[in-house]
Amino acid sequence: MKKEELSRTLLNQAVSLGLCAQWTEQWGEPDQQGLIDKYLHGIDFCIEKGYPTNTFIKEHFDKDILHRNNIFVDEDVQARNMKHIAVLNGNCKGTLLFDGFSTCDIYVRHDSDVTIDCSKFSKVFINVYDRAKTHILQSGAASVYVYIHGEDCIVETDGDVMQRKSQM
């Protein structure tokens, strides 16, 4: 799918799901990186609406660009000190390590099953959705905050981990 088609298809899907007028008017003609930036900036909308689908992401986005932006779908993920935002969609498995002064917002979705190891002075915010399973290890002065969205996800912790259930 060409850049213009991909952007137009995603815009039309988003509008049909209730994208606000401001985002619609400011959409522009983004390339894949621009579309990924929109996805990460509007992650709450995307998660709530199931948009775009995992199949769509896998079929239309370059895996290297997704990985550079810490977005994974149905993959084994072994990473250390990911920055900013990380999104694990579908059936991801793996281990994420955070140490030193690293910070990250992580979204673990669908049927993903990951271990997240936070140590030293890291600060990690973890959102768990759907049927995802997380095992979270905290040590040292690491600050770890877990937000549980739904009744079907599983969160296991070891160490000082703050947990909250989503109000939505």
Where are these regions (language model features)?
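Short, glycine-biased loop/turn motifs at secondary-structure junctions and
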Residues: 1-110, 115, 123-168
